[in-house]
Amino acid sequence: MFRGITTLNLDAKGRLSIPAKYRKSLGICCDGKVIITVDLLEPCLQLYPLPEWEIVERKLVALPSHNRQARYIKRRLIGHAEECELDGHGRILLPLELRSRTELGKNISLVGQGNKFELWDSMVWERQMAKEEASAKEELTRELALLAL
């Protein structure tokens, strides 16, 4: 399970050093092989251990090709999927094509999502979290008012 948020630096060659606490898990579960693809809704990338991606990919392939939304989802997720591998130093080269499709800069937030990671530009991540927190507080305030708390 991948948990927590870690701020990392992307080097000049576009490599991201995966924290040691995750390297062993990635080595055991997928021999360091991962799939990186775009996110459908957010300006971030998704990083899946290969076995987790294969589960997602099977579900995507099973979607009906005559359905417009299903085709869009498959084109985005499968079409942008890149297989990457941890090098001997625990780094992953983030493909330039994928980096250019998001707002990834030098500082990256690696966000654990249980079975995968999200990769965010750290400033974009902070803005997104502030926006979501403000929205959640408004909704929570309404719910608490209804409960008379």
Curated annotation (Swiss-Prot):
Gene3D superfamilies: Transcriptional regulator MraZ domain (3.40.1550.20). Its main location: cytoplasm. GO terms for biological process: negative regulation of DNA-templated transcription initiation. The keyword Repeat applies. Coiled coil: none annotated. One of its GO terms (cellular component) is cytoplasm. One of its GO terms (molecular function) is transcription cis-regulatory region binding. Pfam families: MraZ. SUPFAM superfamilies: AbrB/MazE/MraZ-like. Forms oligomers. Belongs to the MraZ family. This is Transcriptional regulator MraZ. It comes from Nitrosococcus oceani (strain ATCC 19707 / BCRC 17464 / JCM 30415 / NCIMB 11848 / C-107). The gene is mraZ.
